[in-house]
Amino acid sequence: MSAIRKNLCSHITEDVASKLKSAGIKTVVDYVRMDMEHLAQETTIPYKDLVLIRRLLLAQFSTFPVNCADFYQTTIATSSILPTPVNKLNELLDGGLYSSEVTEVAGEISSGKTQFCLSCCVSVVSSAKQNIVYIDTCGGFSADRLAGIAESQLAEEHLEHILQSVKVVAAHDIFQLMSALETVKENMIKKEEPFYDLVKLVIVDSVTAVIYPSLGGQQMDGHGLMVQLSLKIKRLAADFSLAVLIINNVTGDGNVSLGKTWSHVPHNRLLISHARDQKPNVREVVLVKSSKSAVGSKIMLEITEKGTEDIK
C-alpha cells in the first residue's frame, strides 16, 4: 500500500505528512485504521481535516463493485485487435494483438524481432489508425527503416502521418524503462496530449537488455525489480486496454530468456528463428504460449524491404 507522503492527496501537506509520520502513520492502511478523534488529539491536526483526508484516500485507493453488465459493455467498447503485418500470423493469434494483453516475441540476435516491431508500427497506424509508444532499450529503432517500410507499402503523402504516430522513448536501464511506462500511464490518465487519446500499442524492444544487468551480482534485488517491471507492464495493459508487445532473447540452448518467473508475464509468446532449408530472409514463428490458439502451431514469414510479410 502507498506510503503517506506530501501531495498523496490534495490535503496532505508537508506539515500534515510529518505529523502523521511522527504518530506512526506510515501507509494509507495505517491511516484508515486509525480512530480520527484519537489521531486529532495526538497530532493536533483538525478533526474535520483528518476526516476529509480519510474520505479522499478511500476514494483514491478503494476498490468499488461494478455491475457485470456495465463491466461487459465497457470491456467491449474499449477492446481492440490490432493487425500484425503478417496475415498468417494474425490467424495464428486469432486476429492479431489483443488489447489488455501482453504478447512476447523471443528469438536470437538478428532473427528479425525489431524488423517485426517496425512493421507492426506501420500496419497498426495505417490499418487501425492508432498511435504507438515505442520504448527502445538497445538502440535498435531506426526511423529510416520505419520510413522505408512505410514508403514501400503506402503512398508518399502518408509517410509523415506514420512517423508522427510513433513516439520513441529511449530507456537504457530498468529504472528508465519503469519511468517510461509510468509516463505513459500518467499521460493516459491526464489526457492532456492528443497523441495519447489514440495510443493502443506499447512496444518494449527489448526487456532483456535492461533486466539482465540487474540480475548480476545482487540477484535478489534484480529479481525483485524484474517482478516490479512485470507488474507495471501487465497493469498498464489491463488498466488502459492497451496491447503491449515485448521483445525477448533466447539462451544458448534455445530457451526463452529470463526464466520461469518472467514466463508468466506474456499472455502470448512467439518464438522466431531462422528457418531451416529456406532462403536467408525466411523465418519460422512458433506459438509457444497462448490461451486462444493451439500451442505449437507455426507459420513462415519473410523479411524484405517491405518489412516482415507473408511468403509469396
Predicted regions and their residues:
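Hydrophobic, well-ordered secondary-structure scaffolds
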Residues: 1, 19-21, 52, 199, ...
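Short, ordered loop/turn segments at secondary-structure junctions
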Residues: 110, 137-139, 207, 249-250, ...
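The Walker A/P-loop phosphate-binding site
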Residues: 19, 38-43, 49-161, 165
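Amphipathic alpha-helical transducer elements in NTP-driven molecular machines
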Residues: 83-86, 99, 115, 143, ...
